[in-house]
Amino acid sequence: QTYKSYNTTLGLRGDINDDWSYDIYYQNSDVNYANEYRNDLSVIAINRAVNVVNVAGVPTCVAKLQGIDANCVPYNLFQGGLPGDAGIQGVIDGGQTAQDYLAKSTFINGDGKQKILSGYVAGDTGFTIPGAPSSVSLVIGFETKEFAADFRPDTATKMGDRSGSGGATLPIGGMYDVDEFFMEVGIPVTNDLSVDAGFRSAEYSTGSETDSTKIGAYWTVNDNVSLR
């Protein structure tokens, strides 16, 4: 197995004026993987290799005589080995030519991707509740995310030709994205009490939407006790 991971992150932040600032970033992540499966016997090759006839005293594959597979090598399932070895020793005893024909390397590759673009502006609204020590603060932002994954087995794996794989493994892939908007507000009430609230809305490319809200308060009872 081989995994390669790539990640790029770019960001920019600064002040718009004395009261407002901004922060924006972009992230691109990509994970590639390659899996190699060695020495699984080919189901197709086995079926052809055991279908043998005698041609002038020489065991010959029917597939070779019919022009289906010129590389077919006869395989004696009962040659060598011990009971219960599933004929593997027969492949080994058959020599390198039989091993190369019957035992295959197969591959499954794939990747996962993620892209995120996010940003917000934050600042002082200049609006103050009567009696409050400072003005109301506000954060407004957005986030857009894209996710994708791809699973790519080779032809032999898709056909179920790997005798040790338990059957065919089909390719699959997909992606979705989500666009989000959020807002948070901080409201000083007194020197000891402040209230905060937030809202976030998300829209998914799969057709669903979600909204969430929060509200909270922070109260400083004394120098040693605070409640939130």
Language-model features, listed with the residues they occupy:
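Residue-level signature of outer-membrane beta-barrel architecture
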Residues: 10, 14-16, 123-127, 183, ...
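Feature captures outer-membrane beta-barrel proteins of Gram-negative bacteria and organelles
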Residues: 46, 181-187, 211-222, 227
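Sequence/structural signature of outer-membrane beta-barrel proteins
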Residues: 31-33, 147-149, 192, 200-206
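Repeated loop/turn-to-beta-strand initiation elements of outer-membrane beta-barrel proteins
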Residues: 19-22, 149, 192-195, 224-227
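Surface-exposed, low-complexity loop segments enriched in small/polar and acidic residues
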Residues: 1-178
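Short glycine/proline-enriched turns and hinge-like loops at secondary-structure junctions
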Residues: 132-134, 207-210
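Alpha-helix capping and helix-loop boundary segments enriched in small/acidic/polar residues
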Residues: 166-176, 184, 202-207, 216
